[in-house]
Amino acid sequence: MAFCDSIKLEKGMYSVSGKGFTQVLEELDPSENYKGTPMENLDAYQRQLKRFGIKVNGPGCDKVEKFFSAPDSAVLFPEFISRAIKKGLEACDILPSITAAHTFIDGIDYRTISSATETYNESTMGGEGKLIRAVNVTTNDSLIKLQKYGRLFSSTYEALRFQNLDVVAIIFKQIGMDIAYEQLGNAVSTLLPGTSETDAVENASTLGTLTYADLLKLWAKLSPYQPNVMIANADTVKDILSLSNMQDAQAGLAFHGTGHLVTPLGAKLVVSDKVEAQKILGIDKNFALQMIQSGGVTVEYDKVIEKQLEKASVSMTVGFSKIFKGAVKVLNYKSTSQPGG
């Protein structure tokens, strides 16, 4: 009998500080002990599924009630939900493409840092030592507000018990995608320049009509940063894609190969309704945004294990902070003329 078959599963395994359920299982039943065995490609959680004969996908996929055929196996169901939600988060791969750093913390309060390089006047530079400018790194005064993103179940166990696990997993995966898009909206809102950041906005030469020259102005405005991501709402993205320069063969090949829209400048196009019409947010993804996350995907495991699904919730706690303001610029090509004027 393999050691994984003797582990006593308890719901308290979900409440270990700073560790997920699978991490706790791995400490009890390390995967490295299974090298050279038929289970070497399974992690500790997957070995528990195998132990109880629970098949979560493919031919012969089990139904939800299989998890609840024994008290120990019921403990595995919250992790099943969590993994499906994580797949949905990963399927929406936009956040990683606009985030420079993803920081994990244990608490709910986080204070960011900022840096400023001292300026110099070339005419007053004297000896060689004065060529080295100081960089002042300070802690910001205000805390980053982390927000909880989640969903509350309204379905009962009886409504789900005879449903195939692969179908139920798709439902939770879609929940994960929804949460990811909500996070994307707040990330973009964080990136948008505030009212005091007037130097972050570049007005187009011909208001109301987007030209390729305007995109070049945005590219130049971001220097010395690189505009590798452009964010706009759906109508504005249509304007960008309508430019003759967007008929570039390389851009077309990139879209067919990856599913990602890119400009001839090499910048990825991201659609977000948080950006006003006829405005384009250009960022350098390597310097613009920090994502702060407290813990992982949280499932109300005690309620799920007790089959009280209609009262259970899933959530994750995340916040965003702009790192370098200079790595974010806005192109505005909105017409200022008034109707009838």
Show where each model-derived region lies:
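Sequence/fold signature of self-assembling virion shell proteins
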Residues: 2, 246-341
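Assembly/oligomerization interface modules of large self-assembling protein complexes
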Residues: 63-149
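Helix N-cap / beta->alpha transition motif
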Residues: 156, 232-236, 284, 323-324
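Short helix/loop capping segments that flank catalytic or ligand/cofactor-binding pockets
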Residues: 121-123, 163-164, 239-241, 322
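Glycine-rich, charged/polar anion/phosphate-binding loops
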Residues: 139, 214-218, 296-299
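Extended, solvent-exposed, turn-rich assembly/linker loops in the middle of proteins
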Residues: 193-261
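Alpha-helical scaffold segments that mediate packing/assembly in large oligomeric complexes
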Residues: 149-222, 333-341
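Intrinsically disordered, low-complexity terminal tails
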Residues: 1-73, 337-341
